[in-house]
Amino acid sequence: MHPAEVFDYEDIQLVPNKCIIDSRSEADTSIEFGPRRFKIPVVPANMETVINEPLAVWLAEHDYFYVMHRFQPEDRRGFIERMQAKSLFASISVGVKPEEVTFIDELATAGLTPEYITIDIAHGHSDAVIRMIHHIKQQLPNSFVIAGNVGTPEAVRELENAGADATKVGIGPGKACITKLKTGFGTGGWQLAAVRLCAKAARKPIVADGGIRYNGDIAKSIRFGASMVMIGSMLAGHEQSPGSLLTIDGRTFKQYWGSASEKQKGAYRNVEGKQMLVPYRGDIDQTLTAMEEDLQSAISYAGGRNLLDIRTVDYVIVKSSILNGDNY
């Protein structure tokens, strides 16, 4: 890999084109992803501190994509039934352990097909994930399967060839993830370059997962080939977010933790996520609307009308992280 190809979100600036719309409200931020079209290319991370059932219902009702977490496995079947009873799409997560294979069999026997299934493990380029893709496609052929997480073009090709309908890219770039520190592996610090390399190899959609700090990073993800952007910490801490409010020195926070943290595992085993407090951010509707409006502005700067027009713009590598002495 050539060193010039290694960059992250803060190292890139997109180059403006002549604007062809009179108002940013004319810009269309929607994206087709699987069998549906969504308002913006953003999905809250499938983490216990980011998504729960009431929020999943709200998101589905308002044309946003969601992926329910997999940390209450006994309730997943009921969740699918309740969502479909409301005429809403069901989008769940599974792992790769034997009981997950059994769960897929149970869904098939019951005639329950969730529209979206995300196979979600920390190191998704594995034989276990490939076997799980095969199994889901055999038992639930109409489910749209997102597989991950991966960080290389080879992984994307293998998972797509196994039958994945989309792949999720990102090994430890997230704020609550310390995989890069504990193992020495990951896409932390070059997540955007990893998205670019993976998207170039992909024939199917890419989900950029992790490392998003600002709304402009969503546009950068789209520019480098992502169709959907998964966001954790920026979509935690809202009124609708799971977790209790804490007030410290007059400031209000909510708890947030990574997907394999001690808090979640309940015991100290292979911990690759950390606990933190995020500032209370009010209503999630306002945050998502701001993301949509900033994307509309990005489309206007790109000289386009539609989201994917962002893919054609030039970019410069500014390496601000080096200039500023940032080392995360």
Swiss-Prot record:
E.C. number: 1.7.1.7
Binding residues for NADP(+): 206-229
Keywords: NADP, Oxidoreductase
GO cellular component, one term: GMP reductase complex
Residue positions of the active site: C177
A Pfam family: IMPDH
Function text: Catalyzes the irreversible NADPH-dependent deamination of GMP to IMP. It functions in the conversion of nucleobase, nucleoside and nucleotide derivatives of G to A nucleotides, and in maintaining the intracellular balance of A and G nucleotides.
PANTHER family (UniProt xref): GMP REDUCTASE
Descriptive protein name: GMP reductase
Species annotation: Levilactobacillus brevis (strain ATCC 367 / BCRC 12310 / CIP 105137 / JCM 1170 / LMG 11437 / NCIMB 947 / NCTC 947) (Lactobacillus brevis)
